[in-house]
């Protein structure tokens, strides 16, 4: 054992045949720095066995006190100013027989030994900033096993939450505030659960209902409202730092980010159990495979900013690109671990966490979980029936490519041949006749291998160059040609069955050129295709621009065809020579996998979906004269046409911007072939990789394994699935404490733990630890219903307290009691009253729209771009919020449907502390600033809604006093008192009803919840 030997050797000179003397010729700096010179040696050679994860002989070289003292023996191992007698030097230089450290790997070099020796002789200075911390994970509250605590017995407390809260109040000699009045309660509850003010009718009904169950019915009604999902999805969007642009210097719009928002709204409205909610957002493609519409949940992993210039625009093999990937994965893992475990795992990126038991190895184990995904548009079928049908049809199409014995028998059978006869006799036969090239050959200028197949097509294989041009040459017996047909055929040897060679099956045809017996290119007047990828239409293959092209994504795995009609019939020379060049210049391997060329002399217009030459030849024969192979060819064609039509009839797959390993490449961003190797980086430096990371999670959760056991060759999604299971394991105490604290925070404006996303030593401790554990354990063990958790919280007397203390409190002893409470618990951590809080930006905007009668409750779909948009000088567009038509349809929906622009946020919403999505925001700032006052008084949105409210008041009431009374009821939920009615009416008469409405929107009662 290392420490025993150290103890023995103290003060005793030891010699060994393996010992290395000091090489005085080595040049060293005048002063040796621990951080710059010594610590990197320890991290590279020693920390694996003597660090936070493993401490052989209880010795550590990352904690100063242990490094100096010598571990278990407590005998000094590093003697400052005396390297000769320091046992550490004896071991690393081989001065102990049979004991040369490190025991694994290369011995330290003479240079490294000289550095350590000089550092010790200088006094072994070790700054506090570089000193590790010994953390006993079992002692820290958030890592302790989650066990349901006993509910304390409290007189008058009929609810578990009240029992826990009042026990704490009793300890400090405090009393709870009296209940809030019913108007305050319904307004508080309505904004909390659905983010909208109650209507006067709803208030009247609740206030007048004498039934003690009236409050419970109100809670149930609000939780059942579709508005609930909209309100609570917005909270989660803050936490996930969701926005609809990339951010950074190239703030490109994400056209398909919004399905994730709609997923959240649906998940909250459906009360998705929390374990499933977590699993869907981390690994829906594996753990919710029976519900393909849940693929949109993977938008969570891609919700944050993305550096386009680094991850798309620069070369794959650069250091900057590799750094960008590590940073991108850092955002993904931070999003997951901060929001589901409330730990700052990202602080272990460059070194072991300084305060929490999270070693750097755990951080990179989580990096390895996301090593196989990128952020991109991911296609999916939301309908499981459509998905299964698409899969079955693709499988059938693949089988038809090379029919086996059983399929041959089926196709030559009576039923199949009857279908052929019916098809042949039908009037739906295609009219254009196409003839394949004879004696055709194909060459690739880029290095692809093009193999001729019996059907006249060429199958590409072998090398897949970035760019390529296929030169297909042949002869034709036609004398005049009106157009050319390019078929791009599916094949099981191609990615996703093709028809392209890109990993996702796509292709990009940049230009097509046809020459007939000379070098003169035949002009093409018109092009048509059976399918065009958005923004990659077939006309782009004849526009003369190499940067544009025809594509077919997401309809991959299908044959496609394009028709190119000549400007006028072209004469074929006597030798019949035809040359077609298929230029594929977009890059990233967007190459055609199996092309086939045919010609027609029919009169224009020519149309896609016409008969192949071999089928035309067979149809010219009498059925009785056809051979078995010809009958099979015809049956295969008819069945393939049926399958192709069925596939084309299916809805186009939807797209969501999400984590994916299969997507349409952009620039240098391509689907990864598999999970990339992840190495621990010494000090977080990409140039200093050390050991290979194994996918896993956190070792500090004792009940669960820290590394995942995965078979070799599994898809990257298996890693995410294991992480999702780790997160939702009942033995993981972090997940359940985190979510109940998060929900509590949004009801009380602060969590039981103030730092919602930091349950570590730099975060705050819980104000009511037993209550937190009771809520978490009960939530975990009772179905994990978030709606049930809401119900439990808002039905407590603690939630229903008044936010301010009136004269009636404690039998008129208001002064002494409240002064004592403010003195003992100034910031109300013990909840002796309810918190008063300002409405968030969305609630302010939505409340104005609801009050004015302009709110549109249409749900879902693409986000509302409440700005004027023009192209910018570079990627980021020019945004002008002032030019937006506030009365247009895009200006009336709830704020959760606003388009969120990262670098160019809405100034009005920003003034009210609405986050821009650039950072994870578990808790918003709740400020009161001059900017807010100016925004609420001058912004065009406020002015417009004040005008609309005035119009509503004029329509619904006839006198100024009645209009003022209704306005106050709509805005703050109560009748004005006599003085208010007189003053407001005079103001409305003097300055106009719109100005009075404007004032009303600026009152504290409108802006705050009591």
Q: What is each of the regions a protein language model found here?
A:
Residues 1-15:
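Bacterial N-terminal signal peptides
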Residues 21-117, 121, 125-167, 183-188, ...:
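Solvent-exposed helix-loop boundary motif
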Residues 62-66, 125, 129-150, 255-257, ...:
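Primarily the internal scaffold of c-type cytochrome electron-transfer domains
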Residues 422-470, 489-494, 515-575, 672-710:
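Disordered, acidic Ser/Thr/Pro-rich linker "stalks" and the adjacent N-terminal cap
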Residues 480-504, 508-516, 576-586, 597, ...:
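A short beta-strand element within beta-rich, extracytoplasmic domains
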């Amino acid at each position: 054992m290392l420490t025993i030997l150290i103890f023995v050797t103290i003060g005793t000179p030891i010699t060994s045949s393996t010992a290395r003397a000091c090489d005085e010729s080595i040049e060293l700096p005048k002063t040796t720095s621990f951080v710059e010179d010594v610590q990197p040696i320890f991290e590279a050679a020693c920390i694996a066995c003597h660090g936070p994860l493993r401490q052989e002989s209880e010795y550590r070289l990352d904690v100063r006190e242990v490094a100096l003292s010598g571990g278990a023996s407590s005998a000094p191992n590093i003697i400052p100013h005396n390297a000769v007698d320091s046992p550490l030097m004896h071991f690393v230089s081989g001065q102990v027989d049979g004991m040369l450290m490190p025991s694994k790997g290369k011995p330290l070099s003479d240079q490294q030994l000289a550095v350590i020796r000089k550092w010790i002789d200088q006094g072994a200075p070790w700054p506090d900033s570089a000193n590790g911390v010994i953390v006993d994970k079992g002692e820290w509250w958030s890592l302790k096993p989650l066990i349901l605590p006993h509910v304390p017995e409290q007189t008058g407390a009929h609810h578990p939450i009240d029992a826990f809260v009042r026990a704490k109040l009793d300890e400090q000699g405090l009393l709870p505030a009296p209940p809030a009045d019913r108007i305050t309660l319904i307004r508080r509850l309505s904004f909390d659960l659905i983010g909208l003010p109650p209507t006067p009718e709803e208030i009247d009904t609740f206030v007048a209902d004498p039934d003690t169950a009236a409050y419970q019915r109100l809670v149930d009604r609000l939780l059942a409202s579709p508005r609930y999902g909209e309100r609570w999805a917005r909270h989660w969007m803050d936490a996930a730092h969701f926005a609809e642009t990339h951010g950074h210097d190239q703030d490109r719009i994400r056209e398909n980010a919004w399905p994730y928002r709609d997923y959240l709204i649906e998940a909250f409205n459906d009360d998705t159990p929390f374990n499933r909610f977590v699993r869907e957002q981390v690994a829906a493609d594996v753990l919710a495979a029976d519900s393909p519409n849940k693929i949109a949940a993977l938008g969570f992993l891609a919700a944050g900013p993305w550096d386009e210039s680094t991850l798309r625009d620069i070369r794959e093999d650069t250091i900057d690109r590799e750094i960008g990937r590590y940073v991108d994965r850092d955002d993904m893992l931070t999003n997951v671990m901060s929001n589901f475990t409330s730990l700052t795992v990202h602080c272990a990126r460059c070194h072991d966490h300084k305060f929490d038991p999270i070693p750097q190895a755990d951080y990179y184990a989580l990096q390895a979980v996301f090593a196989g995904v990128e952020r991109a548009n991911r296609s999916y079928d939301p309908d499981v029936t459509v998905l299964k049908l698409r899969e079955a049809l693709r499988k059938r199409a693949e089988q038809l490519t090379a029919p086996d014995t059983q399929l041959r028998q089926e196709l030559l059978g009576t039923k199949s041949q009857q279908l052929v006869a019916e098809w042949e006799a039908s009037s739906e036969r295609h009219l254009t006749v196409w003839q394949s090239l004879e004696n055709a050959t194909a060459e690739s200028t880029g290095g692809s291998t093009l193999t001729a197949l019996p059907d006249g097509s060429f199958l590409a294989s072998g090398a897949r160059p970035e760019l390529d041009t296929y030169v297909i040459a042949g002869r034709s017996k036609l004398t005049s040609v009106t157009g050319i047909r390019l078929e791009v055929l599916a094949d099981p040897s191609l990615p996703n069955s093709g028809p392209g060679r890109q990993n996702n099956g796509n292709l990009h045809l940049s230009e097509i050129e046809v020459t007939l017996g000379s070098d003169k290119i035949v002009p093409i007047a018109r092009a048509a295709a059976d399918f065009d990828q958005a923004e990659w239409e077939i006309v782009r293959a004849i526009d003369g621009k190499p940067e544009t092209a025809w594509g077919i994504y997401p309809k991959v795995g299908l044959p496609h065809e394009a028709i190119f009609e000549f400007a006028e019939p072209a004469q074929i020379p006597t030798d019949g020579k035809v040359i077609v060049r298929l230029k594929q210049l977009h890059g990233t391997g967007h190459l055609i996998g199996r092309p086939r060329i045919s010609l027609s002399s029919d009169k224009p217009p020519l149309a896609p979906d016409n008969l192949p030459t071999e089928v035309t030849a067979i149809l010219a024969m009498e059925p009785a004269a056809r051979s078995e192979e010809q009958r099979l060819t015809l049956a295969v064609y008819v069945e393939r046409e049926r399958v192709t039509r069925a596939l084309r009839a299916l809805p186009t797959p939807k797209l969501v911007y999400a984590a994916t390993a299969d997507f349409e490449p952009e620039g240098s961003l391509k689907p990864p072939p598999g999970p990339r190797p992840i190495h621990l980086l010494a000090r977080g430096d990409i140039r200093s990789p050390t050991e290979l990371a194994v996918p896993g999670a956190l070792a500090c959760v004792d009940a669960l394994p820290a590394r995942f056991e995965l078979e070799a060759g599994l898809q990257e999604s298996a890693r995410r699935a294991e992480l999702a299971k780790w997160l939702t394991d009942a033995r993981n105490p972090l997940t359940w404490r985190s979510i109940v604290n998060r929900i509590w925070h949004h009801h009380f404006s602060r969590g039981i733990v103030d730092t919602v996303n930091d349950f570590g030593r730099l975060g705050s401790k819980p104000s009511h630890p037993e209550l937190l554990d009771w809520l978490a354990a009960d939530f975990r063990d009772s179905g994990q219903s978030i709606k049930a958790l809401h119900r439990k919280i808002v039905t407590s007397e603690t939630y229903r307290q008044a936010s301010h203390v009136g004269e009636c409190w404690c039998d008129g002893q208001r002064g002494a009691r409240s002064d004592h409470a403010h003195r003992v618990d100034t910031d109300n951590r013990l909840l002796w009253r309810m918190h008063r809080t300002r409405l968030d930006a969305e609630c302010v905007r939505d409340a104005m729209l609801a009050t004015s009668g302009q709110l549109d409750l249409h749900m879902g779909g693409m986000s509302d771009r409440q700005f004027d948009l023009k192209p910018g000088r570079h990627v980021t567009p020019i945004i002008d919020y002032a030019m937006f038509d506030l009365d247009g349809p895009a200006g009336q929906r709830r704020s959760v449907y606003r388009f969120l622009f990262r670098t160019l946020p809405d100034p009005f919403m920003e003034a009210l502390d609405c986050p821009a999505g650039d950072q994870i925001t578990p808790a918003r700032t709740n400020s009161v600033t001059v900017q807010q006052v100016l925004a609420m008084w001058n912004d065009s949105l406020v002015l417009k809604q004040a005008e609309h409210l005035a119009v509503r008041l004029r329509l619904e009431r006839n006198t100024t006093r009645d209009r003022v009374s209704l306005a106050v009821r709509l805005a703050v939920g109560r009748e004005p008192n006599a003085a208010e009615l007189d003053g407001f009416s005079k103001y409305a008469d003097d300055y106009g009803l719109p100005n009075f409405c404007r004032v009303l929107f600026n009152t504290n009662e409108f802006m705050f919840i009591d």
